[in-house]
Design a protein with these regions (language model features):
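Donor/substrate-binding cores of folate-linked one-carbon enzymes
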Residues: 2-92
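Short, basic/aromatic-enriched C-terminal tail that caps enzymatic domains
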Residues: 86-106
Length: 106
């Protein structure tokens, strides 16, 4: 999802981050649940948000983060280093994401 969840579920996340003059923006990779963008977060990638950038520049930077992080998370899922138990993300001892916490920016 193209935001640092739980911030900005739904659509138009890049514009919302820019309109609110957020200091950071990014992506969240999460399990899908019935709640809109409310599933447990597996990993997040963040960038400093330059408010002088155009929307297209922000989207391009977000795509670069996505293209880096998605395959790494998929590999961990396929290698069963990440799983879901009782609606909580579980990491194996050798997962690169095991010590990561959801990012929080004000």
């Amino acid at each position: 999802h193209p935001s640092l969840l739980p911030k900005y579920p739904g659509l138009n996340t890049h514009q919302q981050a820019m309109d609110n003059q957020d200091s950071h923006h990014g992506i969240s990779i999460h399990y899908v649940t019935e709640e809109l963008d409310g599933g447990p977060i597996i990993a997040q990638g963040a960038m400093k948000l330059d408010l002088q950038s155009s929307l297209e520049e922000v989207i391009d930077k977000i795509h670069r983060i996505e293209h880096d992080l998605y395959p790494r998370v998929v590999a961990e899922l396929l290698d069963m280093k990440v799983g879901l138990k009782d609606n909580t993300v579980q990491f194996s001892h050798d997962s690169e994401f095991k010590d990561a916490q959801p990012l929080q920016f004000n």
